[in-house]
Swiss-Prot record:
Cysteine disulfide partners in this protein: 3-19, 6-24, 10-26
Domain notes: Has the structural arrangement of an alpha-helix connected to a beta-sheet by disulfide bonds.
GO CC term (a single one): extracellular region
Protein name per UniProt: Potassium channel toxin alpha-KTx 9.3
Localization in the cell: Secreted
GO terms assigned for molecular function: ion channel inhibitor activity; toxin activity
Length: 28
């Protein structure tokens, strides 16, 4: 998942989306 889609991708989880080297991470 790209950075721009990260917030939507992580939505619904108690996540704080971060972007590392163009990769989306949902940090719970």
């Amino acid at each position: 998942v790209g950075c721009e889609e990260c917030p939507m991708h992580c939505k619904g989880k108690n996540a704080k989306p971060t972007c590392d080297n163009g990769v989306c991470n949902c940090n719970v």
